[in-house]
Amino acid sequence: APYWYYLCDKYGIYLEDEANIESHEYYYGKQSLSHVPEFRNAHIARNMEMVHATVNHPSVVIWSLGNEAGPGKTFVDCYNAIKAYDTSRPVQYERNNDIVDMGSNQYPSIAWVQGAVQGKYKLKYPFHISEYAHSMGNACGNLIDYWDAIESTNFFMGGAIWDWVDQALDKQDPATGKTYWAYGGDFGKDNKPNDGMFCMNGIMRPDLTPKAQYFEVKKVYQNVGVKAIDMKQGQIEIFNKNYFEPLKNYQIVWSLYKDGVCVKKNQPLQGAKNIVGPREKGIYTLPYDYAS
């Protein structure tokens, strides 16, 4: 939506703008539409319509050729068409790293990410996970394990969660009068019910109220990280995840609990605001007599 681009421009949110292309059922085999000459112009048109529509938005920093639509030469032509118009932004296309400017993959394991940030694989940099953390059901519980690895380096750009919001409609049960979120077989052909729910993958409900995953994502993605280093000595590490801003506008306080009872509450942590600059870490000692 245009308003989303406006908000990203205003608040400095980086956008990867992706062409509306996905031929998932054909996927990466010989039947992929990316190999079919008759679909070449349609692929290029969709990419260029995207570029023409949003090229003047400063929040758009990456172009994406599409998603899960095959490895054919058509996408080389799409890349060349974009570059002939705009050379100021890198172009990515999931997994097809040899034809674009940056690297990506989908749904890697945590172990793979831990190896990747240590330089164990031959990757094209900058690198990001173009799709991960499928948010269906009770999901995203291991998100912190991905980000402990990702945040250990500055050349791994993170990833894109599948996806933002559950896609369902408010519907009324004629028998009870109660409303519910309808999806899949609730609109089945010839009134044939099924449990297909592959549209319910979001971290938000259809009415944009948060699900449990939302709060996990918010915590993991927060701009300031805090990690225990040696709690017997009261030592913690503060990581300023921002790339441009120091912590001067943050109020950092700490509380200490013993067996669930608060013994120190909202104590200011002096010095951290002025010391921790962008992408810097600092170790601080909480002033408390732990021997007592």
Spans of features found by a protein language model:
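Substrate-binding/catalytic cleft of secreted carbohydrate-active enzymes
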Residues: 1-200
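Carbohydrate-binding surfaces of carbohydrate-active enzymes
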Residues: 149-292
